[in-house]
């Protein structure tokens, strides 16, 4: 803590202030000299961090002498700007500004090693500027105490003032150790000056005391007479009841009107002890009937006056010490920032720019990653969904012709199938390569064939397709009348004496009739197996199923059989391999294409290319109906032949088919219905077909 080392008797302008000494104004009659010891700013005795000190020395050596001199100069604006930002107490800010102005005017080395120039410029001494170790200790050891010192100052919650600048501090408080603390920090010269009491000031304190305690007129006169004896205006020998021992240690100067009090600590403590009940509080009526009691009242007022003076000195000392520390640490912090900015300019890039560059680099890396992800998703969407080029607009006449062709196509397709059902019934022509009749399964794709029973013929022309639409309690169809069994050649029609080829389509090549008996059986069996849920399905949804089935089976004029019988190729869906159709059938009778083949040639003239997906789980690209029809022509001349051994091996490996058959059928129905719903609004051709066809 700072000490009081001297008294400015002739005025502070003429006093020779040394390093770290500032004047301390007490009142109009007293100004002391306040000094900060050297151990407060010991720049040589600290143990510094070796790595940080080495780095600082390296940075210090980077600067030339001229650059270092420029870096170690800051203006008053920078210091006061930091003051307004860091210090909340308005009293502290005003005190710092006042002290800085005093140092600018006087030029005293009060902040050494900091110096204050006449133009308000704050700098460092040459010895500290050139010594890297001292500079490091000043910047990073003492300079780091600024925030801690500001945070440690108690502040009022009401107005953010510190205790030293609040109004409550000016009121005297009960005696404590504060007077002893300030008494110990005073030099002998300061103590002698403190105990030198002005008689007029003591009289003012005495009158206040008499009014406070309501002394009567006689008692008040007794006290005033005792005061006059103390200052030497009355002869004490003439006063009856006067006690000279009470005024022991007190000496008056009548010419200068001073009262000299003994500066011994014990005597001062005795006087302050008399005044302690007064500071404890409470007003009471007091009397002084005799002169000795009046003397004691005068000593009490002397103790009050002395305590108030010591309390004022203690308050001024602490406030000025806090002000000096704030100004010193603010100057050190401003110089440190100036030094670091100069070093960064020499290096060519600041730490802030480095940080911004790091953030920019991270942002660029993040953008590259996101761009790669977007490109991957874009490529994945391109591979999954191949978009067709937009078709040109058609006139109203072309649309009318297209609708007529669609109607003709539906009529021809029904004739080719030989169906005798009404317009609400939708069937699909599925033709086999076994020279047998065609069948009309309701699901659109044939599942694997069941296991062959004993006594059954490998060839059959039944037409119930093994399909049961009932969702609960219905038995699955047998091989008797199953189109799968007929297709694979494992039905038992031969056991009943029927010719395996009795239903071949050789009646009329010009007709579209094929296997009328199979159609009739299929219609009868399918009608019996329908449940209520199947009947409630909308006609439009069933027509969508029919359109999907019609698009999967087309005629191919390039494939012909020498026997003249109709050749059929069926879509096969293997539940263990692929869930997508891979081939399409082509049908031709006696060298003359079926009616829907002629219609297929006309389809590209009026169909609009749209996006199409085979199903939600399809991994292939979407293809239009025209592309599917074109691909159907690319069947090879050599048809895939499945031997009887392969069929039996397949049946043996899939014994659990019957138990899961209803699940497979339901799964296929849901997928097909979903496809129809997704593509109903996209294809005008399909919509045209659906309006002319029904569904089972």
Swiss-Prot record:
Where does the record place it?
Cytoplasmic vesicle
Q: Which GO terms describe its cellular component?
A: cytoplasm; cytoplasmic vesicle; nucleus
Q: What is its main location?
A: cytoplasm
Specify whether Phosphoprotein is a keyword of the entry: yes
Q: In its UniProt record, which GO terms are filed under biological process?
A: cell differentiation; labyrinthine layer blood vessel development; labyrinthine layer development; negative regulation of cell population proliferation; negative regulation of gene expression; negative regulation of receptor signaling pathway via STAT; spermatogenesis
User: Which InterPro entries does the entry mention?
Assistant: GGNBP2
Keywords carried by this UniProt record: Cytoplasmic vesicle, Developmental protein, Differentiation, Phosphoprotein, Spermatogenesis
Q: Does the keyword Disulfide bond apply?
A: no
Query: Any transmembrane segments, and where?
Result: none
**Superkingdom of the organism of origin:** Eukaryota
Instruction: Tell me the residues on which Phosphoserine occurs.
Output: 360
Complexes and interactors: Interacts with GGN.
Give the protein's biological function: May be involved in spermatogenesis.
| UniProt protein name | Gametogenetin-binding protein 2
Protein's gene: Ggnbp2
